[in-house]
């Protein structure tokens, strides 16, 4: 799959194992056309994840690495922070747990804001309270996709488009059957997004 996960995986493999052959099979005419191309562009910092969990640790490290990658490739991004807004007392109570979770995940600068404080930041926001999360960010994910493609190709990898995997066969090697041809490899990494279960079958 040629979404953000498949492309980032290919890039890492090429960096960690110089000289290997890596091919990304993408079913669409261009990479990043599904979930990657339609997401909100938010860089999540780990606020919502269980403290100590792998997901929380990867979110904290991932936002750092993504900001570094974007700076290196001149990709529009900003660590602009966000407000988590409580619209009623029940949400305000839950926000305290979110605050504690964020602190446990190592997020610095979290601030509890009252209605006046949050409206100083965003005058048009509705709600009774907010949690200011300075580490959250935004990014142009289509630009990230194109930078990953360029880097993969510069490292000797290839992106094969219009290559929907219609079948997989295992003998001495794996062979992926696609409309663009059959491709054999020692290893296949399934990064097919929402369709990864179908590919696995």
Give the residues covered by each predicted segment.
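Conserved Rossmann-like nucleotide-cofactor binding loop
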Residues: 5, 30, 195
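Local beta-strand N-terminus motif with an aromatic residue
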Residues: 18, 74, 185-186
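Gly/Ala-rich phosphate-binding loop of Rossmann-like dinucleotide-binding domains
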Residues: 10, 14, 151
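Helical element adjacent to the flavin cofactor pocket in flavoenzyme catalytic cores
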Residues: 131-187, 191-198
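Dinucleotide-binding Rossmann-like beta1-alpha1 core, especially the glycine-rich loop
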Residues: 41-121, 127
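Glycine-rich FAD pyrophosphate-binding loop
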Residues: 14-38
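General small-molecule cofactor/ligand-binding pocket signal
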Residues: 23, 110-113, 158-160
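Glycine-rich Rossmann-fold phosphate-binding loop(s) that bind the pyrophosphate
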Residues: 1-7, 27
């Amino acid at each position: 799959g040629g979404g953000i996960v498949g492309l980032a995986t290919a890039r890492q493999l090429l960096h960690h194992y110089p000289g290997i052959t890596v091919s990304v099979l993408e079913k669409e005419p261009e990479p990043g056309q599904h979930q990657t191309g339609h997401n909100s562009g938010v860089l999540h910092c780990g606020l919502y994840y269980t403290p100590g969990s792998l997901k929380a640790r990867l979110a904290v490290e991932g936002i750092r690495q993504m900001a570094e990658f974007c700076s290196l490739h001149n990709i529009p991004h900003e660590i602009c922070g966000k407000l988590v807004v409580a619209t009623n007392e029940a949400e305000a109570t839950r926000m305290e747990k979110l605050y504690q979770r964020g602190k446990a995940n190592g997020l610095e600068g979290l601030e509890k804001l009252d209605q006046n404080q949050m409206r100083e930041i965003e005058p048009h926001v509705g709600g009774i309270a907010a949690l200011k999360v300075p580490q959250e960010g935004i990014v142009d994910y289509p630009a990230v996709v194109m930078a990953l493609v360029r880097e993969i190709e510069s490292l000797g990898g290839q992106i094969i488009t219009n290559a929907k995997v219609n079948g997989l066969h295992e003998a001495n090697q794996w062979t992926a059957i696609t409309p663009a041809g059959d491709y054999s490899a020692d290893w296949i990494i399934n990064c097919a997004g929402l369709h990864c279960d179908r590919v696995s079958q």
